[in-house]
Amino acid sequence: MDEYEAQLLVVEQALLVTTDAQQREELIALRANLEELLALTRSSETEDINETNTQQATDIDDELKRFQNELSSLEGEQTDSQDDQQRLEELRTKYNALLGEKCSAPHEHSWGALSYHNALICGVDDELILDKNGILDVRLRVLFTNPTHREMLPCNYYLEGECRFDETRCRYSHGALVPGAAIKDYNAPDFCRLARNCPVLAKLQDRLWHRGRVLCVNFMEQQCRVRLDGQEHKERERDFPFEELFPLIVEEDDELSSDSEETNETDGSDAANESDMDDVEAARQARMVELSLFTFKPNERLGAWEQYTRGIGSKLMASMGYIHGTGLGSDGRGIVTPVSAQILPQGRSLDACMELREAANGDKDYFSIERKLKRAQRRQQAANEKAYERESKRTDVFAFLNGSVLGQGSQRAENSTKTTKIDNLQQHTNKSLNVETVRIADDIRRKQRDIAKTQQSLARNAIDSQLQKRLSSQLQSQKQELATLQAQESSLSKEQQTRKSKNKMFEF
């Protein structure tokens, strides 16, 4: 703006001095343009100032409205927080009266099952929660009095106030947090229910309560003999005092008058007990199946050697509760494949062995003895195949006799076989023919003894039809082998007789 005014002043001074008409016209046009430009600039600045003032006024109004809204929201939050605090105080007052009381609290197991157990209320949480129905509630901290699993077992150091770990790092329980609405009445143990086959929980030395069944009860000495469930207990039958037992509640049918109805009631109670045990077994089976789905599957399945047997090992393991795809042990976490033995090179350091393994692309089974045995087995198999091919190409006296005696075909084939037989037998010396004759005679005597034993077995086992059939086929094959040996002996004797005749003719 100032520059434009300075230029306009210079143009007016030039007009006063200039006398040339053409220059004056140009200066007058330039002055008109500058005056128009100054007028437009002044009008735009005035509009900008007005818009700025209007915008500032609008921003102030918006800021005032936001400030008022924030004040109202703060007042509402303060009111809500006061209401929540009042509700929390009411719930804390209500549940603080239950501190130290016994109750029945829910516990969710790792496989998803939910069950109620007796517990002791030891604290109230400071935070409000919303239950399933949208009602405000607080959580209570409870310690289970009859823990059946490791995660339910209370920490002794926590009870004494000396535990060095927090709730997430400690292996034992510092108290489970359960909603106050989920708390139920305490189930007091009723020892009058103790009877034979009654399901109970028994406390062992690991402070866990294990399931079992009552064998006998002594109410005078308040002792009970219990058979514990599961295979992990070495002594399944033990004596427990009543203080270390907790009878499980079993729904019973109404009492009936007749004896037959009482018998039906007993059967119904046993069925309920069995259904209870079936539920536990079903939960264990579900956990094992879940474990098999999320467990790394090895390349070799358990019992792979049974492809050569009838699978009796797998049948026995299945009858004992083993689930295919899981590991060994009661919890299904044991190894399936044996630990591979490693044989390191003799006289080499561990660093040198590691360098060898790294040179083999980090193969973990580089020094495995199983791999070496399989490699040696493949080499031996290849050597056996080569030896078999080599032996099959060789033609000895027995192979020649078998081919000549058992071979069948046209007359031309027989003539060629006879010619080959004569030629091959003539190639052998008298000594080799005598040796083969002795061997064949021994085989004939041995085969005759086998035939005699088979005939005795047939006579002794005349009742068993399957054995008779198998022995008959065996006897028939032995007779065929005997006939083959006798034919070979006849051929050898003919060759020897021919040579003797020729010798006599030459001597004559």
From Swiss-Prot:
- Zinc fingers classed as C3H1-type: ranges: 154-177
Q: PANTHER family recorded for this chain?
A: ZINC FINGER CCCH-TYPE WITH G PATCH DOMAIN-CONTAINING PROTEIN (PTHR46297:SF1)
Q: What does this protein do?
A: Transcription repressor.
Q: Which PROSITE patterns match?
A: G_PATCH (PS50174), ZF_C3H1 (PS50103)
Domain of life per record: Eukaryota
Keywords noted in UniProt: DNA-binding, Metal-binding, Nucleus, Repressor, Transcription, Transcription regulation, Zinc, Zinc-finger
Q: Spell out the Polar residues composition-biased ranges.
A: 486-495
What are the G-patch domain coordinates in residue numbering?
309-355
InterPro entries, per database record: G_patch_dom (IPR000467), Znf_CCCH (IPR000571)
Protein name listed in UniProt: Zinc finger CCCH-type with G patch domain-containing protein
Q: Where in the cell is it found?
A: Nucleus
Bias category Basic residues: which stretches?
499-508
Q: Return the annotated region ranges for Disordered.
A: 253-279, 486-508
The Swiss-Prot or TrEMBL record annotates one GO molecular function as: zinc ion binding
A GO CC annotation recorded here is: nucleus
Pfam families, per the entry: G-patch
Q: Does the keyword Transcription apply?
A: yes
| TM helices/strands, residue ranges | none
